[in-house]
Amino acid sequence: GAVFVGVALFLTLGVKDLILAKRDERYLALVVILLFGTGMWFFADADAGGSLFQTLILGAFFFALAASYVRALGENRELPAELRLHLRASALVSALLIAEWTWALFLLPLSEAHRFMLFFIPAALLVSFLGEYAAGGPSRRSVLAHASIFIGSLVLLLASVEWGM
């Protein structure tokens, strides 16, 4: 069911005159929506994420989404092969960071909602950052905005947790 909806949404966003059009913003929106749904599904079950194996599978899914987004950006903007390879390596490093971050979240006494938001915000920011990197490199303003959003949301979410031993 969910796979069918994902494919239907992808085709609805990308098909124009029976040709798959290159649409960067819509592809980014699709990737973020899929990250949101996957994160909700992953963190909904309290027993789902405590193991390293399951968090690595989540990281592999993040890599698949980020790598496909980077590949679509590379094809759309006709980037050199070396930059495409570098972007793919950046997607892999981002996926490993997300997997480690997710695994670390299970070490903290957080609710499923807090874990989900602490997963989703950095994951969406990393995908957005990869898109800006493919567009010629992020500006200082963009780096500052991404870092501010991450740190601000981290502080707000961790401040809202009832820390009881």
Question: What are these model-predicted stretches?
Answer:
Residues 1-7, 48-62, 111-122:
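Structural signature of hydrophobic alpha-helical transmembrane segments
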Residues 1-6, 29-35, 56-61, 86-103:
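Hydrophobic alpha-helical transmembrane segments
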Residues 39-52, 102-114, 161-165:
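Helix-coil boundary and interhelical linker segments in multi-pass alpha-helical membrane proteins
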Residues 1-40:
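Hydrophobic alpha-helical segments and helix pairs
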Residues 30-74:
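Hydrophobic, aromatic-enriched interface-forming segments
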Residues 8-23, 65-83, 127-137:
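C-terminal ends of transmembrane helices
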Residues 94-98, 115-130:
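Hydrophobic alpha-helical membrane segments
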Residues 142-163:
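Final/C-terminal transmembrane alpha-helix of multipass membrane proteins
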